[in-house]
Amino acid sequence: MPQIGLVSAVNLRVQGSSAYLWSSRSSSLGTESRDGCLQRNSLCFAGSESMGHKLKIRTPHATTRRLVKDLGPLKVVCIDYPRPELDNTVNYLEAAFLSSTFRASPRPTKPLEIVIAGAGLGGLSTAKYLADAGHKPILLEARDVLGGKVAAWKDDDGDWYETGLHIFFGAYPNIQNLFGELGINDRLQWKEHSMIFAMPSKPGEFSRFDFSEALPAPLNGILAILKNNEMLTWPEKVKFAIGLLPAMLGGQSYVEAQDGISVKDWMRKQGVPDRVTDEVFIAMSKALNFINPDELSMQCILIALNRFLQEKHGSKMAFLDGNPPERLCMPIVEHIESKGGQVRLNSRIKKIELNEDGSVKSFILSDGSAIEGDAFVFAAPVDIFKLLLPEDWKEIPYFQKLEKLVGVPVINVHIWFDRKLKNTYDHLLFSRSSLLSVYADMSVTCKEYYNPNQSMLELVFAPAEEWISRSDSEIIDATMKELATLFPDEISADQSKAKILKYHVVKTPRSVYKTVPGCEPCRPLQRSPIEGFYLAGDYTKQKYLASMEGAVLSGKLCAQAIVQDYELLVGRSQKKLSEASVV
């Protein structure tokens, strides 16, 4: 049964048996306050322009921008799909049980004050579940925006630009539980169960892998591969299937053993033709870790395939219905604060101050203030942690292993065009270009970004190592050349067709850790050898690697370790107080 907001017949395309009709300013996004900030359960930042640094770059064509937004409430049609049945899968139930242990744990007689550095998904998750267990997290974020790798900013036109193109899979059980626990399942816009790849040899054309709703996993995935005859030949499919047999039969132990070999080398070792790697796994490698298959560890691919093929809805994708800081991070913040926790922006860690015994005394902020607590968590990226690693810890093997973990550069590009592009889908698209990874027309896929007259393409530019230091204009020029192949009838590199109204280029020199062969043994457990000090983040040890799901799970595991260490941490605090009173 369709859910109806303000409805018109704009671009109505039926893509499935269930259609969701919505308005970009209907109740699904909240009501509009006097200051223009949409409000629903107070989940918005007022004056969101202050959430990040402006990267706005005008072009001569920008004078026609914002026409639609000035016409009043938009009447919008969006074809989304119902939330899939995820709640009874083994992984979802396992994640739900872990969440329940925090709510069910005995209320502490003395709640711990835990200082957490970094308000990305790892830090937010750690704080959320510690608050659920009755403790008082103090979450410190260096910047003026929440989200870490899912941060976003609003420009002077009211348009958002993001750190990355974020996709929520059915195979993300801890993320899906988190949305349910916060009561925001309706903020995920589920798309058709397909994977859509551009065809470089046929400019402007796409090839699809469509997953049947009638079949269980892994049959729906196998059928999707067998039905696609445009990317792989039958002999290639057979050789690929034979090559995958050891992974399918060997289970998790086999998957973990493939950490030391690259995707390309593994494929050749298994007798899989190079064309399979070129046709499928270049795109998949770039989407998973922003690097090519000659660098990526095969373990990463096998983990993804395992999740996608073992769960019926594992590879089904959803977009968040708006910007991540307001639509995802703020509900977590409000949950934390409702239980007595704190979240502080503009609180950059300058130094980890130690006690004489080598344990953490406080986090020193850039303004000179010291934040003390009963326990400390560093949930910022591994590259930042290594810069702040105390000298006394550098010879400890646990910390020495972190040298192998290095963030990978990535660039996120947003381009607003003067017209609606036709050669696109309401979905994530794999570009299969040499410079671009995945992209989406966010004016179609996302409620908050909807525009019936003008497209906004958000594109992941990867691998980005050779481009991260180049100018924004060079990156845009290179992107337009790639788009001319994807949209041959609508885009040309010289803008003689669709014209750029404006663009934003967001560079992240060190994003998720680069999952090259040999990284797995270097990933740290959340509980460090330093009593009272813990790590969280997608680079820490958890089974979902470098992803939003991995970050959320790392936070839960970190919170679990702290709850388990409650007696030890209380004892440390009492000893500290008694020593202070003697002095």
UniProtKB/Swiss-Prot annotation:
It comes from Solanum lycopersicum (Tomato). It is found in: Plastid, Chloroplast; Plastid, Chromoplast; Membrane. GO terms for molecular function: phytoene dehydrogenase activity. This is 15-cis-phytoene desaturase, chloroplastic/chromoplastic. Its cofactor is FAD. GO terms for biological process: carotene biosynthetic process; carotenoid biosynthetic process. Pathway: Carotenoid biosynthesis; lycopene biosynthesis. Substrate binds at R307, A546. Its EC number is 1.3.5.5. The gene is PDS. GO terms for cellular component: chloroplast; chromoplast; membrane. Belongs to the carotenoid/retinoid oxidoreductase family. It catalyses: 2 a plastoquinone + 15-cis-phytoene = 9,9',15-tri-cis-zeta-carotene + 2 a plastoquinol. Homotetramer.
